[in-house]
Amino acid sequence: YSRRFGPLEIAKAASRGEGTPFSILTNIEPDGSLVPPDHKEALRARANQLWHTDSCFKDPPALASVLSARVIAPAGGETEFASTRLGWERLPDSMRARLADTCAWHDYAHSRGKIAPHLASQRERSTLPRVRWRIRWRNPANRRDSLYIASHTCAIEGMAKEEAQELIEQLIAHATAPGHTYLHRWQPGDVIMWDNRSSQHYAVNDYF
């Protein structure tokens, strides 16, 4: 199904599913037990609680993601989505003009470092150097703009570090404001596909 939309992304180094087109998200050990809270998979799940856009730290970044629910927690574990196209359109004209030609840097290790200093392994750091993208992402098909910024965003060109981080947090909060999101409550067999160029999402990590 997903191959109809283009070449499939290969899962990154040091992840479950490495070397395949599948990223496996689980909190269950091979023996059926739950991973402890300090386990790397539990920490990665905490990192997925940050609003993010999949693979914006890669070149090329992900066009879309397809997520299928196989085994779900008895309660919790929802995924919340926000439209960054709407987020861009809701910005004041002055802010859109300011950001239109501005670029930002995206770094996998940056977002993981918010959870634990060494959550991103050395292999991940060496194979995923930070990348630069324009903050205004224009869809080549419909020419509509989106706000391409999320928790992986580590810097903005031409801005001091603290000033950039403050603006990044403000933009994420703006795009994900209450009343502008969709919360999906998973059922076994559900499949959701989304456009990473015009959305952010996060996993509600309340099942560990």
Please identify what each model-predicted range represents.
Residues 1-193, 197-208:
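Fe(II)/2-oxoglutarate oxygenase catalytic core
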